[in-house]
Amino acid sequence: MNQTKCIFYSAILMIFCAPAVHSQNLTDIYCGHLLNTETGNWLRNALIKVDQGSGRVKELASYTTVSKDNSGSSLDLSDQFCLPGLIDMHTHISEDVSGDLIEFYTISQEEQLKIGRVNARITLMAGFTTVRDVGVYIAWTDKKLRDEIDAKMTPGPRMKVAGYYLTIPGGGGEVAVPGYEGEVPDHIRAGVARGADAFREKAKRVIEGGADHIKLIASGAVLAYGSLPGSPEMTQEEIAAVVEEAQKTGIRVTAHAHGALSIKQAILAGVKSIEHASLIDDEGIELARINGVSLTMDVYNGDYINEMGLLDGMPEEFLEKNRETTEIQRANFRKAHQAGVKIVFGTDAGVYPHGQNAKQFSYMTKHGMTKLEAIQAATVRAAEVLGMSQEIGQVEEGFFADIITVSNNPLIDIKSLEDIQYVIKEGYLYKDRNKQ
């Protein structure tokens, strides 16, 4: 067992030996400072009234004094900087950090779910109240976890899930380990296809199965054997077939695409969201801009792999591909941002430890964004890409009462978002700095 995994399972023991997550249903939340994520302005002395039945904000007002009742339904955050709950647009919550892909051949879905439940709680405690989970190797694990969270059986962020990857045989979305001669479970290959008609059928099945969006693997991957990040895997015709099927039901499609050609093919095929975009060229940037395509660029992830990859058991092939893509991705992040392309916050958490998601904010500001733009990427801009711009990403009347707090102004100290003090999701208090 590698060092990171030892740390991870130690964390599991600590979590399950600790008291249950604190959950308190609130009606009145008193925020000393509340960030308007559209304007960047702070609202002083904001009183947020919550409808307990729906978990949504029913009134946003102001206060002069904090009124406390004996029911425990009010919360004094007058010394805090309050923001809407954060959104991570690229997670793998049911997976942990490991370079040993053979594990996916033998682990059961229930075992994978146990890992996911721990990671869901960790992610929520880090201030992320919504995530777009973009693929699992064991089909539908993400859906089961989503449904448990929605039923309040498991504490975690609101999840929008893909069900499984759509990928070519041996592609970046399939577990393919050189020299492995054992049995490959069917649930590992649920989305494997070749040809436009076959991919159209796979898209139909994943939609009917309950996916919130579709994740397809357009190019090679960094963390896959024999897969080259710059090389196309799916054809433009195959991608277009998936998009056409998804459009029938309004399902959104996002494409894993490192390579410049795959990025352009995905955009021309109608995909509206690109993951990684490491090797995007000027033509791809312009195509993304004029077509309103968002980029999810995980600009922190490369440093973690460089520093911890060997300890996590990652083979040299993976580490070398990571070295080849890390800095060019960051340069292209800056270019795309300067060109006016919408960039949303997404970390690839699962490749590095869950709960460290907020480390990416400082990388986004280092490579060209203002602090407000980085926060917007994880709130209002991400909500737009999810199709939830009237529900999350802001604290406004009618929106879900998802609120997090920090002790310092994140527009001055962006790293304060790495130390969340309170977490409220749908009016329920899940994290209280005084009751850890």
Region roles according to the model:
Residues 27-28, 34, 39-83:
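Histidine-rich, glycine-flanked metal-binding segment
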Residues 95-112, 172-188, 222-236, 293-326:
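Active-site gating loops and adjacent loop-to-helix segments of metal-dependent hydrolytic enzymes
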